[in-house]
Design a protein with these regions (language model features):
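A short beta-strand-turn-helix
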Residues: 33-50
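Non-catalytic, surface beta->alpha helical segment in thiol-disulfide oxidoreductase systems
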Residues: 101-137
C-alpha cells in the first residue's frame, strides 16, 4: 500500500495489533487485505470495525463494489479495516456465514458479527451504514 502522505510503499499485515502505519513517516495506512479460510479468524479479531467483503471474480456487482470499498478504506483510515474473501477459493467462510448471494458484506468487531449487507450498495449508503456502526462504539 502506498502511503497517502509520503508515497512510500508498505506491506500491510493481514492481522496486527492496532492500525498499520507507514514505515517511513508513521502515518496511518488504509487497512485493506485479502484473507483465506485459514487466516479469517485472525484477520477479523480486532476491536476496530471490520468490513468483510465476500466476493468472487466472476461476479459483476462484486467488481462494482470493490473500488467503493477501497475508497472507504482510504477515507476512513484508522476507523475501519476491509477484509476481502474470495468465496470460490475460500468456501468455508462463505458457508460459515450462509453466503447464498454475493457480494455479501459482513460488519464485525472483535471477531463477532454485528451486521450484514447483501448486494452492491452505492458509496453514500455504505458510508452511512458504517457511520452508524462507528457511532455505536
Amino acid at each position: 500500500v502506498a502511503c497517502p502522505s509520503c508515497g512510500t510503499k508498505n506491506r500491510v499485515p493481514e492481522a496486527a495489533n492496532g492500525s498499520p502505519r507507514c514505515a517511513s513517516c508513521k502515518t496511518e495506512l488504509p487497512w485493506l487485505v485479502n484473507t483465506t479460510d485459514a487466516g479469517f479468524a485472525k484477520a477479523v479479531n480486532t476491536p476496530q470495525l471490520v468490513l468483510v467483503d465476500l466476493w468472487a471474480p466472476w461476479c459483476g456487482p462484486c467488481r462494482m463494489v470493490a473500488p467503493v470499498l477501497e475508497k472507504l478504506s482510504k477515507d476512513l483510515v484508522g476507523q475501519i479495516k476491509v477484509v476481502k474473501v474470495n468465496v470460490d477459493e475460500n468456501p468455508m467462510v462463505a458457508q460459515q456465514y450462509n453466503a447464498r448471494s454475493i457480494p455479501m458484506l459482513l460488519f464485525m468487531r472483535n471477531g463477532e458479527l454485528v451486521d450484514t449487507v447483501i448486494g452492491a450498495q452505492p458509496e453514500h449508503m455504505l458510508r452511512g451504514h458504517i457511520d452508524q456502526l462507528l457511532a455505536k462504539v
